[in-house]
Regions:
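N-terminal catalytic scaffold of extracellular/periplasmic and nuclease hydrolases
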Residues: 4, 137-139, 199
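Extended, compositionally biased alpha-helical segments that mediate assembly or anchoring
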Residues: 588-610
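A cross-kingdom signal targeting lumenal/periplasmic-facing segments of multi-pass membrane
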Residues: 135, 140-162, 166, 174-175
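Short linear recognition/processing motifs and adjacent strand/loop elements at protein termini
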Residues: 96, 116-142
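N-terminal Sec-pathway targeting helices
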Residues: 1-15
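Non-catalytic propeptide/linker segments at domain boundaries
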Residues: 107, 114, 118, 126, ...
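Primarily the internal scaffold of c-type cytochrome electron-transfer domains
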Residues: 7-10, 22-121, 163-208, 213, ...
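Non-catalytic protein-protein interaction scaffold segments in large eukaryotic complex-forming proteins
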Residues: 18-20
Length: 610
Protein backbone atom coordinates (compact mmCIF):
# COMPACT_ATOMS: atom_id res chain seq x y z
CA UNK A 1 0.00 0.00 0.00
CA UNK A 2 2.78 2.39 1.00
CA UNK A 3 4.64 1.54 -2.21
CA UNK A 4 1.56 2.42 -4.27
CA UNK A 5 1.17 5.73 -2.44
CA UNK A 6 4.86 6.46 -3.04
CA UNK A 7 4.53 5.65 -6.74
CA UNK A 8 1.44 7.83 -7.02
CA UNK A 9 3.26 10.65 -5.26
CA UNK A 10 6.19 10.38 -7.68
CA UNK A 11 3.83 10.47 -10.68
CA UNK A 12 2.02 13.53 -9.31
CA UNK A 13 5.34 15.26 -8.60
CA UNK A 14 6.60 14.57 -12.13
CA UNK A 15 3.35 15.93 -13.58
CA UNK A 16 3.57 19.04 -11.41
CA UNK A 17 7.17 19.67 -12.43
CA UNK A 18 6.27 19.18 -16.10
CA UNK A 19 3.32 21.55 -15.71
CA UNK A 20 5.44 24.20 -14.03
CA UNK A 21 8.11 23.91 -16.72
CA UNK A 22 5.49 24.17 -19.48
CA UNK A 23 3.81 27.15 -17.79
CA UNK A 24 7.17 28.83 -17.26
CA UNK A 25 8.06 28.28 -20.91
CA UNK A 26 4.67 29.64 -22.00
CA UNK A 27 5.07 32.72 -19.79
CA UNK A 28 8.60 33.31 -21.08
CA UNK A 29 7.35 32.93 -24.65
CA UNK A 30 4.62 35.52 -24.06
CA UNK A 31 7.08 37.85 -22.35
CA UNK A 32 9.47 37.53 -25.29
CA UNK A 33 6.63 38.19 -27.74
CA UNK A 34 5.58 41.28 -25.77
CA UNK A 35 9.17 42.51 -25.56
CA UNK A 36 9.52 41.98 -29.27
CA UNK A 37 6.33 43.93 -29.92
CA UNK A 38 7.48 46.77 -27.67
CA UNK A 39 10.86 46.88 -29.40
CA UNK A 40 9.16 47.18 -32.78
CA UNK A 41 6.91 49.96 -31.50
CA UNK A 42 9.88 51.82 -30.03
CA UNK A 43 11.99 51.70 -33.19
CA UNK A 44 9.37 52.00 -35.94
CA UNK A 45 8.33 55.32 -37.44
CA UNK A 46 4.63 54.65 -37.98
CA UNK A 47 4.13 58.15 -39.37
CA UNK A 48 5.57 56.86 -42.66
CA UNK A 49 2.79 54.27 -42.99
CA UNK A 50 -0.71 54.86 -44.28
CA UNK A 51 -3.58 53.05 -45.98
CA UNK A 52 -3.35 55.74 -48.64
CA UNK A 53 -0.13 54.07 -49.80
CA UNK A 54 -0.13 50.26 -49.36
CA UNK A 55 3.08 49.82 -51.41
CA UNK A 56 5.12 47.16 -49.60
CA UNK A 57 8.31 48.93 -50.69
CA UNK A 58 7.22 51.95 -48.63
CA UNK A 59 6.27 49.87 -45.60
CA UNK A 60 9.47 47.87 -45.99
CA UNK A 61 11.55 50.96 -45.24
CA UNK A 62 10.21 50.73 -41.71
CA UNK A 63 10.37 46.92 -41.57
CA UNK A 64 13.30 45.93 -43.81
CA UNK A 65 13.79 42.42 -42.38
CA UNK A 66 10.21 41.42 -43.17
CA UNK A 67 10.35 42.93 -46.67
CA UNK A 68 13.61 41.13 -47.42
CA UNK A 69 11.99 37.81 -46.48
CA UNK A 70 8.87 38.54 -48.53
CA UNK A 71 10.85 39.41 -51.65
CA UNK A 72 12.72 36.09 -51.56
CA UNK A 73 9.52 34.70 -53.11
CA UNK A 74 10.22 36.76 -56.23
CA UNK A 75 13.82 35.61 -56.64
CA UNK A 76 13.85 31.98 -55.48
CA UNK A 77 14.47 29.18 -57.96
CA UNK A 78 11.39 27.20 -59.01
CA UNK A 79 11.23 23.86 -57.18
CA UNK A 80 8.70 21.08 -56.79
CA UNK A 81 7.62 18.74 -54.03
CA UNK A 82 5.35 15.73 -54.39
CA UNK A 83 2.27 17.90 -53.88
CA UNK A 84 3.39 21.52 -54.07
CA UNK A 85 6.35 23.76 -54.66
CA UNK A 86 6.65 27.00 -56.63
CA UNK A 87 7.25 25.70 -60.16
CA UNK A 88 4.17 26.89 -62.06
CA UNK A 89 3.77 23.81 -64.27
CA UNK A 90 0.41 22.99 -65.85
CA UNK A 91 -1.72 21.06 -63.39
CA UNK A 92 -3.94 20.09 -66.32
CA UNK A 93 -1.01 18.15 -67.77
CA UNK A 94 -0.26 16.49 -64.44
CA UNK A 95 -3.95 15.84 -63.70
CA UNK A 96 -5.75 15.56 -67.09
CA UNK A 97 -8.95 14.49 -65.33
CA UNK A 98 -9.44 18.16 -64.41
CA UNK A 99 -10.15 19.04 -68.06
CA UNK A 100 -13.17 16.72 -67.88
CA UNK A 101 -14.26 17.71 -64.38
CA UNK A 102 -14.25 21.39 -65.41
CA UNK A 103 -15.51 20.97 -68.99
CA UNK A 104 -17.22 24.21 -70.00
CA UNK A 105 -15.36 26.35 -67.45
CA UNK A 106 -12.21 28.49 -67.95
CA UNK A 107 -10.19 26.37 -65.51
CA UNK A 108 -10.36 23.54 -68.04
CA UNK A 109 -8.06 25.56 -70.32
CA UNK A 110 -5.54 27.10 -67.92
CA UNK A 111 -4.62 26.00 -64.41
CA UNK A 112 -1.06 26.10 -63.07
CA UNK A 113 0.69 25.33 -59.81
CA UNK A 114 0.72 28.39 -57.52
CA UNK A 115 4.04 30.15 -56.96
CA UNK A 116 3.59 32.31 -53.87
CA UNK A 117 1.87 35.43 -52.54
CA UNK A 118 4.17 37.85 -54.37
CA UNK A 119 2.91 36.48 -57.70
CA UNK A 120 -0.84 36.36 -57.12
CA UNK A 121 -1.72 39.51 -59.07
CA UNK A 122 0.93 38.96 -61.75
CA UNK A 123 -0.49 35.52 -62.48
CA UNK A 124 -4.11 36.69 -62.23
CA UNK A 125 -3.54 39.34 -64.90
CA UNK A 126 -1.76 36.88 -67.19
CA UNK A 127 -3.92 33.78 -66.95
CA UNK A 128 -6.04 32.85 -69.95
CA UNK A 129 -8.96 32.68 -67.51
CA UNK A 130 -8.85 36.50 -67.52
CA UNK A 131 -8.53 36.84 -71.32
CA UNK A 132 -11.97 37.25 -72.91
CA UNK A 133 -10.84 37.04 -76.53
CA UNK A 134 -8.75 33.93 -75.90
CA UNK A 135 -11.56 32.13 -74.08
CA UNK A 136 -14.20 33.15 -76.63
CA UNK A 137 -11.93 31.89 -79.42
CA UNK A 138 -11.17 28.61 -77.67
CA UNK A 139 -14.57 27.14 -76.92
CA UNK A 140 -15.96 29.37 -74.17
CA UNK A 141 -18.12 31.76 -76.16
CA UNK A 142 -20.25 32.83 -73.17
CA UNK A 143 -17.36 34.25 -71.11
CA UNK A 144 -17.94 38.00 -70.57
CA UNK A 145 -14.87 38.91 -68.53
CA UNK A 146 -13.80 38.69 -64.90
CA UNK A 147 -15.23 41.12 -62.34
CA UNK A 148 -13.16 43.27 -59.99
CA UNK A 149 -14.38 40.91 -57.26
CA UNK A 150 -11.43 38.71 -58.27
CA UNK A 151 -9.07 41.46 -57.09
CA UNK A 152 -10.17 41.09 -53.46
CA UNK A 153 -7.55 38.43 -52.85
CA UNK A 154 -5.10 39.19 -55.63
CA UNK A 155 -4.37 42.89 -55.24
CA UNK A 156 -3.03 44.77 -52.24
CA UNK A 157 -4.67 47.85 -53.75
CA UNK A 158 -8.18 46.50 -53.10
CA UNK A 159 -9.03 48.55 -49.94
CA UNK A 160 -7.76 51.73 -51.63
CA UNK A 161 -9.86 51.03 -54.73
CA UNK A 162 -12.99 50.30 -52.70
CA UNK A 163 -12.56 53.60 -50.86
CA UNK A 164 -11.42 55.88 -53.69
CA UNK A 165 -12.91 54.43 -56.88
CA UNK A 166 -16.05 52.64 -55.69
CA UNK A 167 -16.59 55.37 -53.05
CA UNK A 168 -16.96 52.80 -50.32
CA UNK A 169 -19.63 50.82 -52.19
CA UNK A 170 -18.51 47.18 -51.92
CA UNK A 171 -21.17 45.99 -54.35
CA UNK A 172 -20.08 48.55 -56.95
CA UNK A 173 -16.44 47.50 -56.53
CA UNK A 174 -17.21 43.81 -57.04
CA UNK A 175 -19.51 44.47 -60.00
CA UNK A 176 -17.02 46.61 -61.94
CA UNK A 177 -15.05 44.89 -64.67
CA UNK A 178 -11.62 43.64 -63.56
CA UNK A 179 -9.66 45.47 -66.28
CA UNK A 180 -11.60 48.68 -65.72
CA UNK A 181 -10.74 48.67 -62.02
CA UNK A 182 -7.07 47.90 -62.72
CA UNK A 183 -6.78 51.11 -64.73
CA UNK A 184 -7.43 53.14 -61.57
CA UNK A 185 -4.44 51.94 -59.52
CA UNK A 186 -2.36 55.09 -58.90
CA UNK A 187 1.35 55.71 -59.41
CA UNK A 188 2.97 56.33 -56.00
CA UNK A 189 6.37 56.85 -54.40
CA UNK A 190 8.02 58.36 -57.45
CA UNK A 191 6.70 55.77 -59.91
CA UNK A 192 6.02 57.41 -63.28
CA UNK A 193 2.43 57.03 -64.43
CA UNK A 194 1.90 54.48 -67.24
CA UNK A 195 5.53 53.35 -66.97
CA UNK A 196 6.72 49.72 -66.78
CA UNK A 197 7.16 50.25 -63.03
CA UNK A 198 3.55 51.42 -62.78
CA UNK A 199 2.49 48.20 -64.50
CA UNK A 200 4.78 46.10 -62.31
CA UNK A 201 4.53 44.17 -59.02
CA UNK A 202 6.57 46.53 -56.80
CA UNK A 203 3.84 48.95 -55.78
CA UNK A 204 2.27 49.04 -59.25
CA UNK A 205 -0.76 47.46 -60.86
CA UNK A 206 0.62 43.93 -60.48
CA UNK A 207 1.33 44.24 -56.77
CA UNK A 208 -0.07 41.22 -54.95
CA UNK A 209 -0.30 40.69 -51.20
CA UNK A 210 1.08 43.59 -49.19
CA UNK A 211 1.71 44.51 -45.54
CA UNK A 212 -1.46 46.60 -45.22
CA UNK A 213 -3.64 43.59 -46.03
CA UNK A 214 -3.02 42.19 -42.55
CA UNK A 215 -1.42 45.00 -40.50
CA UNK A 216 -2.70 48.25 -39.02
CA UNK A 217 -0.40 51.13 -40.08
CA UNK A 218 -0.73 52.75 -36.64
CA UNK A 219 0.90 49.95 -34.66
CA UNK A 220 1.25 46.90 -36.96
CA UNK A 221 -1.40 44.98 -35.02
CA UNK A 222 -3.29 42.38 -37.03
CA UNK A 223 -6.56 43.36 -38.70
CA UNK A 224 -9.02 42.26 -41.37
CA UNK A 225 -9.24 44.55 -44.41
CA UNK A 226 -11.54 42.54 -46.68
CA UNK A 227 -15.29 43.21 -46.29
CA UNK A 228 -16.29 39.73 -47.52
CA UNK A 229 -14.33 38.10 -44.71
CA UNK A 230 -15.78 40.42 -42.08
CA UNK A 231 -19.33 39.86 -43.37
CA UNK A 232 -18.82 36.09 -43.38
CA UNK A 233 -17.41 35.99 -39.86
CA UNK A 234 -20.34 38.07 -38.60
CA UNK A 235 -22.69 35.55 -40.25
CA UNK A 236 -20.94 32.84 -38.23
CA UNK A 237 -21.44 34.69 -34.94
CA UNK A 238 -18.46 37.01 -34.57
CA UNK A 239 -18.96 40.62 -33.51
CA UNK A 240 -17.73 43.47 -35.70
CA UNK A 241 -14.85 45.61 -34.50
CA UNK A 242 -13.97 49.01 -36.03
CA UNK A 243 -10.22 48.41 -35.78
CA UNK A 244 -9.63 44.66 -36.16
CA UNK A 245 -12.65 43.93 -38.34
CA UNK A 246 -14.08 41.48 -35.81
CA UNK A 247 -13.55 41.00 -32.10
CA UNK A 248 -11.01 38.21 -31.68
CA UNK A 249 -7.93 37.35 -29.63
CA UNK A 250 -4.46 37.84 -31.05
CA UNK A 251 -4.13 34.07 -31.48
CA UNK A 252 -7.41 33.96 -33.41
CA UNK A 253 -6.26 36.86 -35.56
CA UNK A 254 -3.13 34.89 -36.52
CA UNK A 255 -5.51 32.60 -38.41
CA UNK A 256 -8.29 35.01 -39.37
CA UNK A 257 -6.01 37.29 -41.39
CA UNK A 258 -5.32 34.27 -43.61
CA UNK A 259 -9.03 33.47 -43.73
CA UNK A 260 -9.58 36.68 -45.67
CA UNK A 261 -8.61 34.75 -48.80
CA UNK A 262 -7.83 31.09 -48.12
CA UNK A 263 -11.52 30.21 -48.29
CA UNK A 264 -14.33 29.05 -50.54
CA UNK A 265 -16.32 31.92 -52.07
CA UNK A 266 -18.79 32.79 -54.80
CA UNK A 267 -20.18 35.90 -56.49
CA UNK A 268 -23.70 36.35 -55.14
CA UNK A 269 -26.07 38.23 -57.48
CA UNK A 270 -27.93 41.07 -55.77
CA UNK A 271 -30.81 40.94 -58.24
CA UNK A 272 -30.49 44.67 -58.84
CA UNK A 273 -28.71 46.97 -61.24
CA UNK A 274 -25.81 49.00 -59.86
CA UNK A 275 -24.00 52.04 -61.22
CA UNK A 276 -20.29 51.38 -61.75
CA UNK A 277 -17.36 52.71 -63.72
CA UNK A 278 -17.34 51.59 -67.34
CA UNK A 279 -15.29 52.61 -70.39
CA UNK A 280 -16.06 54.86 -73.37
CA UNK A 281 -14.63 52.19 -75.67
CA UNK A 282 -18.18 50.82 -75.69
CA UNK A 283 -19.14 53.83 -77.84
CA UNK A 284 -16.36 53.30 -80.40
CA UNK A 285 -17.83 51.12 -83.15
CA UNK A 286 -14.35 50.42 -84.56
CA UNK A 287 -13.37 48.45 -81.44
CA UNK A 288 -14.51 44.84 -81.67
CA UNK A 289 -13.89 41.63 -79.80
CA UNK A 290 -12.50 38.61 -81.64
CA UNK A 291 -16.03 37.37 -82.30
CA UNK A 292 -17.07 40.66 -83.94
CA UNK A 293 -19.16 42.03 -81.07
CA UNK A 294 -18.69 45.53 -79.65
CA UNK A 295 -15.93 45.92 -77.05
CA UNK A 296 -17.23 47.13 -73.71
CA UNK A 297 -13.81 47.34 -72.04
CA UNK A 298 -10.16 47.39 -73.04
CA UNK A 299 -8.27 44.34 -71.79
CA UNK A 300 -5.26 46.45 -70.87
CA UNK A 301 -4.02 47.97 -67.60
CA UNK A 302 -3.81 51.62 -68.73
CA UNK A 303 -6.25 54.11 -70.23
CA UNK A 304 -5.20 54.55 -73.87
CA UNK A 305 -6.31 55.64 -77.36
CA UNK A 306 -8.87 58.08 -76.02
CA UNK A 307 -10.60 55.46 -73.88
CA UNK A 308 -11.93 57.05 -70.68
CA UNK A 309 -14.10 56.26 -67.69
CA UNK A 310 -17.86 56.59 -67.94
CA UNK A 311 -20.70 55.61 -65.63
CA UNK A 312 -22.69 52.55 -66.66
CA UNK A 313 -25.25 50.21 -65.15
CA UNK A 314 -24.58 46.52 -64.66
CA UNK A 315 -25.93 43.55 -62.71
CA UNK A 316 -24.93 43.80 -59.06
CA UNK A 317 -22.93 41.08 -57.30
CA UNK A 318 -21.12 40.68 -54.00
CA UNK A 319 -18.16 38.50 -53.12
CA UNK A 320 -19.58 36.11 -50.51
CA UNK A 321 -18.19 33.31 -48.35
CA UNK A 322 -20.83 30.54 -47.92
CA UNK A 323 -20.39 30.31 -44.17
CA UNK A 324 -23.74 31.02 -42.53
CA UNK A 325 -24.31 27.29 -41.86
CA UNK A 326 -20.84 27.03 -40.25
CA UNK A 327 -21.26 28.54 -36.79
CA UNK A 328 -18.50 30.01 -34.65
CA UNK A 329 -16.72 27.38 -32.58
CA UNK A 330 -17.76 24.49 -34.85
CA UNK A 331 -15.46 22.47 -37.08
CA UNK A 332 -16.39 22.79 -40.73
CA UNK A 333 -18.20 19.90 -42.45
CA UNK A 334 -18.76 19.58 -46.20
CA UNK A 335 -22.50 19.08 -45.62
CA UNK A 336 -22.60 22.72 -44.48
CA UNK A 337 -21.81 23.72 -48.06
CA UNK A 338 -24.54 21.38 -49.34
CA UNK A 339 -27.03 23.07 -47.03
CA UNK A 340 -25.87 26.58 -47.86
CA UNK A 341 -25.82 26.23 -51.63
CA UNK A 342 -29.17 24.42 -51.61
CA UNK A 343 -30.73 27.35 -49.73
CA UNK A 344 -29.42 29.98 -52.17
CA UNK A 345 -30.07 27.93 -55.29
CA UNK A 346 -32.82 30.26 -56.44
CA UNK A 347 -30.34 33.15 -56.39
CA UNK A 348 -27.14 31.31 -57.29
CA UNK A 349 -27.56 27.94 -58.95
CA UNK A 350 -24.02 27.13 -60.00
CA UNK A 351 -20.63 28.45 -61.02
CA UNK A 352 -21.12 26.71 -64.36
CA UNK A 353 -23.23 24.17 -66.20
CA UNK A 354 -21.15 21.11 -66.99
CA UNK A 355 -20.58 20.88 -70.72
CA UNK A 356 -20.90 17.08 -70.89
CA UNK A 357 -23.51 16.21 -68.26
CA UNK A 358 -25.59 19.37 -67.86
CA UNK A 359 -25.11 19.29 -64.07
CA UNK A 360 -25.08 22.52 -62.05
CA UNK A 361 -21.52 22.58 -60.72
CA UNK A 362 -20.05 24.52 -57.80
CA UNK A 363 -16.35 25.24 -58.44
CA UNK A 364 -14.63 25.21 -55.06
CA UNK A 365 -11.76 27.66 -54.42
CA UNK A 366 -8.85 27.26 -51.96
CA UNK A 367 -10.81 26.35 -48.75
CA UNK A 368 -7.84 25.99 -46.40
CA UNK A 369 -9.57 27.81 -43.53
CA UNK A 370 -12.59 25.52 -43.63
CA UNK A 371 -10.64 22.25 -43.70
CA UNK A 372 -8.10 23.35 -41.08
CA UNK A 373 -10.86 24.29 -38.60
CA UNK A 374 -11.62 20.66 -37.81
CA UNK A 375 -8.06 19.38 -37.71
CA UNK A 376 -5.84 18.44 -34.80
CA UNK A 377 -3.73 21.60 -35.07
CA UNK A 378 -6.76 23.89 -34.81
CA UNK A 379 -8.02 21.85 -31.86
CA UNK A 380 -4.73 22.51 -30.09
CA UNK A 381 -4.71 26.24 -30.73
CA UNK A 382 -2.13 26.23 -33.51
CA UNK A 383 -2.62 29.13 -35.93
CA UNK A 384 -1.79 29.45 -39.62
CA UNK A 385 1.03 31.84 -38.72
CA UNK A 386 2.59 29.37 -36.26
CA UNK A 387 3.31 26.94 -39.10
CA UNK A 388 3.54 29.05 -42.26
CA UNK A 389 5.22 32.12 -40.74
CA UNK A 390 7.18 30.74 -37.77
CA UNK A 391 9.45 32.84 -35.59
CA UNK A 392 13.04 33.00 -36.80
CA UNK A 393 16.11 34.88 -35.63
CA UNK A 394 17.42 37.85 -37.60
CA UNK A 395 20.53 38.77 -35.66
CA UNK A 396 19.37 39.66 -32.16
CA UNK A 397 15.76 40.02 -33.30
CA UNK A 398 13.01 37.45 -33.24
CA UNK A 399 10.68 38.00 -36.22
CA UNK A 400 7.97 36.09 -38.04
CA UNK A 401 9.14 34.54 -41.30
CA UNK A 402 7.49 36.62 -44.03
CA UNK A 403 8.08 34.47 -47.10
CA UNK A 404 4.82 32.69 -46.17
CA UNK A 405 5.63 29.19 -47.35
CA UNK A 406 5.26 25.50 -46.59
CA UNK A 407 6.32 24.46 -43.08
CA UNK A 408 8.37 21.73 -44.76
CA UNK A 409 10.74 24.43 -46.00
CA UNK A 410 11.83 25.06 -42.39
CA UNK A 411 10.75 22.14 -40.22
CA UNK A 412 13.03 23.20 -37.39
CA UNK A 413 11.29 26.56 -36.94
CA UNK A 414 7.77 25.56 -37.98
CA UNK A 415 7.35 22.12 -36.42
CA UNK A 416 10.00 21.37 -33.83
CA UNK A 417 8.88 24.02 -31.37
CA UNK A 418 6.12 21.48 -30.57
CA UNK A 419 7.27 18.18 -32.10
CA UNK A 420 10.48 16.71 -30.75
CA UNK A 421 11.07 14.04 -33.40
CA UNK A 422 13.72 14.41 -36.11
CA UNK A 423 13.12 16.53 -39.20
CA UNK A 424 13.28 13.43 -41.40
CA UNK A 425 10.65 11.70 -39.29
CA UNK A 426 8.29 14.67 -39.38
CA UNK A 427 8.68 15.13 -43.12
CA UNK A 428 7.98 11.42 -43.67
CA UNK A 429 4.83 11.66 -41.55
CA UNK A 430 3.52 14.56 -43.63
CA UNK A 431 4.26 12.77 -46.89
CA UNK A 432 2.58 9.59 -45.65
CA UNK A 433 -0.60 11.52 -44.83
CA UNK A 434 -0.54 13.32 -48.17
CA UNK A 435 0.06 10.10 -50.11
CA UNK A 436 -2.94 8.52 -48.41
CA UNK A 437 -5.22 11.49 -49.14
CA UNK A 438 -3.87 11.76 -52.71
CA UNK A 439 -4.81 8.11 -53.27
CA UNK A 440 -8.36 8.88 -52.16
CA UNK A 441 -8.31 12.05 -54.29
CA UNK A 442 -7.32 10.27 -57.48
CA UNK A 443 -9.79 7.45 -56.81
CA UNK A 444 -12.61 9.97 -56.39
CA UNK A 445 -11.64 12.00 -59.45
CA UNK A 446 -11.37 8.93 -61.67
CA UNK A 447 -14.76 7.71 -60.42
CA UNK A 448 -16.39 11.08 -61.16
CA UNK A 449 -14.83 11.27 -64.63
CA UNK A 450 -16.19 7.76 -65.25
CA UNK A 451 -19.64 9.00 -64.18
CA UNK A 452 -19.31 12.04 -66.46
CA UNK A 453 -18.40 9.98 -69.51
CA UNK A 454 -21.20 7.50 -68.82
CA UNK A 455 -23.72 10.31 -68.33
CA UNK A 456 -22.67 11.88 -71.62
CA UNK A 457 -23.11 8.51 -73.34
CA UNK A 458 -26.62 8.05 -71.97
CA UNK A 459 -27.56 11.65 -72.77
CA UNK A 460 -26.63 10.99 -76.39
CA UNK A 461 -28.67 7.78 -76.49
CA UNK A 462 -31.71 9.39 -74.89
CA UNK A 463 -31.41 12.28 -77.33
CA UNK A 464 -32.06 9.87 -80.17
CA UNK A 465 -35.46 8.96 -78.69
CA UNK A 466 -38.54 10.88 -79.78
CA UNK A 467 -39.83 11.42 -76.25
CA UNK A 468 -36.66 13.33 -75.37
CA UNK A 469 -36.79 15.54 -78.45
CA UNK A 470 -38.42 18.81 -79.45
CA UNK A 471 -38.80 19.73 -83.12
CA UNK A 472 -36.86 16.62 -84.06
CA UNK A 473 -33.80 17.51 -81.97
CA UNK A 474 -32.56 16.35 -78.59
CA UNK A 475 -34.14 18.48 -75.85
CA UNK A 476 -31.50 19.12 -73.18
CA UNK A 477 -34.10 20.11 -70.56
CA UNK A 478 -36.12 16.92 -71.00
CA UNK A 479 -32.99 14.78 -70.80
CA UNK A 480 -31.74 16.64 -67.71
CA UNK A 481 -35.10 16.13 -66.02
CA UNK A 482 -34.84 12.39 -66.65
CA UNK A 483 -31.30 12.40 -65.25
CA UNK A 484 -31.90 14.84 -62.39
CA UNK A 485 -30.90 12.40 -59.63
CA UNK A 486 -27.69 11.54 -61.47
CA UNK A 487 -26.88 15.21 -62.08
CA UNK A 488 -27.36 15.99 -58.40
CA UNK A 489 -24.99 13.17 -57.46
CA UNK A 490 -22.49 14.53 -59.98
CA UNK A 491 -22.78 18.01 -58.44
CA UNK A 492 -22.23 16.83 -54.87
CA UNK A 493 -19.53 14.28 -55.67
CA UNK A 494 -17.56 16.85 -57.64
CA UNK A 495 -17.97 19.46 -54.91
CA UNK A 496 -16.23 17.08 -52.51
CA UNK A 497 -13.39 16.04 -54.81
CA UNK A 498 -12.90 19.63 -55.93
CA UNK A 499 -12.82 20.80 -52.31
CA UNK A 500 -9.83 18.61 -51.46
CA UNK A 501 -8.18 19.35 -54.80
CA UNK A 502 -8.50 23.13 -54.33
CA UNK A 503 -7.39 22.97 -50.68
CA UNK A 504 -3.65 23.33 -50.91
CA UNK A 505 -2.46 20.94 -48.17
CA UNK A 506 -3.37 17.67 -49.96
CA UNK A 507 -5.51 16.94 -46.93
CA UNK A 508 -2.85 17.52 -44.28
CA UNK A 509 -4.82 20.28 -42.54
CA UNK A 510 -7.47 17.68 -41.65
CA UNK A 511 -6.83 14.24 -43.19
CA UNK A 512 -9.84 12.57 -41.58
CA UNK A 513 -12.30 15.09 -43.00
CA UNK A 514 -10.54 15.14 -46.38
CA UNK A 515 -10.74 11.37 -46.70
CA UNK A 516 -14.35 11.34 -45.49
CA UNK A 517 -15.28 13.80 -48.25
CA UNK A 518 -13.45 11.80 -50.88
CA UNK A 519 -15.00 8.49 -49.85
CA UNK A 520 -18.40 10.18 -50.08
CA UNK A 521 -17.44 11.39 -53.57
CA UNK A 522 -16.57 7.86 -54.69
CA UNK A 523 -19.81 6.53 -53.23
CA UNK A 524 -21.88 9.24 -54.94
CA UNK A 525 -20.17 8.66 -58.29
CA UNK A 526 -20.84 4.91 -58.12
CA UNK A 527 -24.45 5.54 -57.05
CA UNK A 528 -24.77 7.80 -60.08
CA UNK A 529 -23.52 5.06 -62.37
CA UNK A 530 -26.01 2.60 -60.85
CA UNK A 531 -28.85 5.04 -61.49
CA UNK A 532 -27.69 5.48 -65.10
CA UNK A 533 -28.09 1.73 -65.62
CA UNK A 534 -31.58 1.87 -64.07
CA UNK A 535 -32.62 4.85 -66.23
CA UNK A 536 -31.25 3.19 -69.35
CA UNK A 537 -33.19 0.00 -68.62
CA UNK A 538 -36.37 1.97 -67.90
CA UNK A 539 -36.07 3.54 -71.35
CA UNK A 540 -35.48 0.26 -73.16
CA UNK A 541 -31.72 0.54 -73.45
CA UNK A 542 -30.39 -2.90 -72.64
CA UNK A 543 -26.96 -3.80 -71.30
CA UNK A 544 -25.88 -0.21 -70.67
CA UNK A 545 -22.27 -0.54 -69.55
CA UNK A 546 -20.59 1.80 -67.09
CA UNK A 547 -16.89 2.59 -67.13
CA UNK A 548 -14.10 2.46 -64.56
CA UNK A 549 -11.33 4.72 -65.83
CA UNK A 550 -7.82 4.47 -64.42
CA UNK A 551 -4.52 6.33 -64.68
CA UNK A 552 -3.71 5.28 -68.25
CA UNK A 553 -7.23 6.08 -69.47
CA UNK A 554 -7.04 9.52 -67.87
CA UNK A 555 -3.78 10.38 -69.68
CA UNK A 556 -5.73 10.48 -72.95
CA UNK A 557 -7.27 13.78 -71.77
CA UNK A 558 -3.85 15.47 -71.43
CA UNK A 559 -4.26 18.90 -73.13
CA UNK A 560 -0.55 19.68 -73.36
CA UNK A 561 0.82 23.20 -72.92
CA UNK A 562 -1.51 26.09 -73.73
CA UNK A 563 -1.27 27.37 -77.32
CA UNK A 564 -3.28 29.71 -79.51
CA UNK A 565 -5.37 27.63 -81.89
CA UNK A 566 -6.48 30.64 -83.95
CA UNK A 567 -5.13 34.14 -84.60
CA UNK A 568 -6.18 36.40 -81.70
CA UNK A 569 -5.02 39.91 -80.72
CA UNK A 570 -1.76 39.93 -82.69
CA UNK A 571 -1.00 36.38 -81.58
CA UNK A 572 -0.72 33.71 -84.25
CA UNK A 573 -2.17 30.21 -84.19
CA UNK A 574 0.49 27.86 -82.86
CA UNK A 575 2.04 30.46 -80.54
CA UNK A 576 2.57 29.40 -76.93
CA UNK A 577 0.29 31.37 -74.60
CA UNK A 578 3.02 31.79 -71.98
CA UNK A 579 5.75 32.42 -74.55
CA UNK A 580 7.42 35.04 -72.34
CA UNK A 581 7.56 32.80 -69.23
CA UNK A 582 9.36 29.51 -69.80
CA UNK A 583 8.69 28.22 -66.27
CA UNK A 584 4.91 28.74 -66.47
CA UNK A 585 2.43 26.18 -67.87
CA UNK A 586 5.11 23.67 -68.82
CA UNK A 587 5.20 19.94 -68.27
CA UNK A 588 5.48 18.76 -64.67
CA UNK A 589 8.67 16.89 -63.77
CA UNK A 590 8.52 13.27 -64.89
CA UNK A 591 9.00 11.97 -61.35
CA UNK A 592 5.72 13.59 -60.27
CA UNK A 593 3.78 11.72 -62.95
CA UNK A 594 5.49 8.49 -61.94
CA UNK A 595 4.54 9.15 -58.32
CA UNK A 596 0.89 9.79 -59.30
CA UNK A 597 0.79 6.54 -61.28
CA UNK A 598 1.63 4.55 -58.14
CA UNK A 599 -1.07 6.19 -56.00
CA UNK A 600 -4.25 4.80 -57.56
CA UNK A 601 -4.21 1.88 -57.16
CA UNK A 602 -1.85 2.30 -54.20
CA UNK A 603 1.50 0.60 -54.86
CA UNK A 604 2.88 0.39 -51.33
CA UNK A 605 6.04 -1.40 -52.46
CA UNK A 606 7.10 1.65 -54.47
CA UNK A 607 5.66 4.40 -52.28
CA UNK A 608 6.97 3.05 -48.98
CA UNK A 609 10.52 3.01 -50.35
CA UNK A 610 10.35 6.79 -50.72
Amino acid sequence: MKKNILRLGIVVLVLLIAGVLWLNNDINQKKEDEANKNAIAANADFSLLSDDDPNFEKWGKVFPEQLKMYLTVEKEEPKTTEFGGNLAYSKLIRFPQLTILWAGYPFSLDFNEERGHFWVQVDQMKTARNNKDFLNAHGLAAFKGQPAACMNCHSGWTPWLIKNVAKGDFTAFNSTNYWTMIKNIPAVDGIVENSPEHAGPHGGKRMGVTCADCHNPNDMSLRLTRPAAINALVSRGYEKDPVQGVKATREEMRTLVCSQCHVEYYFKPTGEKVKVMGETIVDDSSKKWWNGTQKNYDEYEFWRDGNKAKEIETDGMVLTFPWSEWKKGQPFRIEMLDDYYDKVRGVFGADFIHKLTGAQIIKIQHPESELYSGGVHAANGVSCVDCHMPYVREGAKKVTQHNITSPLRDINSACKSCHKQSEDYLKAQVLDIQNSVAHDQRTAEYAIVSLIMDTKKLRDELGNMEKFQSDGKADAKKISEELKEVLELHRKAQMRADFVNAENSTGFHNPREASRMLLQAVDMARMGQTKLVEIAAANGIKDFKTSNLGFEDIQKFNPGELYYKVDVNNHKAGERYYADEKDVNGNPPKELLEHDKELAPYNYQVIDKK
